[in-house]
């Protein structure tokens, strides 16, 4: 199950006490801020959570799975996320408690 923006808005409404309009504006502004920073080539560091950064990937050979024909996969820039140590520890603790 995925956490959606709508669910984030609901949680802000329930747990923080923002009204739904304010909560939606907050969530939208947060993602706009992240998007703008990445568009400017900035790294995003969220303490206790992780880092978002841009990575350049070189062109490489690929293959059309239907025909087997070799095709080039063009160079591109991708967004990567590296989880922080605190997030890793919390996820590990949660996963460990479910086994």
Swiss-Prot record:
> Pfam families, per this entry?
Bac_DNA_binding
Q: Which PROSITE patterns match?
A: HISTONE_LIKE (PS00045)
Matches recorded under InterPro entries: Hist_DNA-bd, Histone-like_DNA-bd_CS, IHF-like_DNA-bd_dom_sf, IHF_alpha
For this chain, the annotated S-S bridges are none
Q: Does the keyword Nucleotidyltransferase apply?
A: no
**Which keywords appear in this protein's UniProt record, sorted alphabetically?**
DNA recombination, DNA-binding, Transcription, Transcription regulation, Translation regulation
Signal peptide start-end:
none
Q: Which SMART domains match?
A: BHL
Q: Which residues form a coiled coil?
A: none
The Swiss-Prot or TrEMBL record annotates one GO molecular function as:
structural constituent of chromatin
A GO biological-process term: regulation of DNA-templated transcription
Q: Which domain of life is it from?
A: Bacteria
GO CC terms: cytosol
Task: Spell out the HAMAP family in the cross-references.
Answer: IHF_alpha
Role according to the record: This protein is one of the two subunits of integration host factor, a specific DNA-binding protein that functions in genetic recombination as well as in transcriptional and translational control.
Similarity-based family: Belongs to the bacterial histone-like protein family.
* Quaternary structure (record): Heterodimer of an alpha and a beta chain.
Q: What is this protein called?
A: Integration host factor subunit alpha
| Source organism | Xylella fastidiosa (strain Temecula1 / ATCC 700964)
């Amino acid at each position: 199950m995925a956490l959606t923006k709508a669910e984030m808005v609901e949680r802000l409404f329930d747990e923080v006490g923002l009204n739904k309009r304010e909560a939606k504006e907050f969530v939208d502004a947060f993602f706009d801020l992240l998007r703008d920073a990445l568009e400017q080539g900035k790294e995003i560091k969220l303490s206790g959570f992780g880092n978002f950064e841009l990575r350049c990937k070189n062109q490489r050979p690929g293959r059309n799975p239907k025909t087997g024909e070799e095709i080039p996969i063009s160079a591109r820039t991708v967004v990567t996320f590296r989880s922080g140590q605190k997030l890793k520890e919390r996820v590990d603790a949660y996963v460990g408690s479910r086994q």
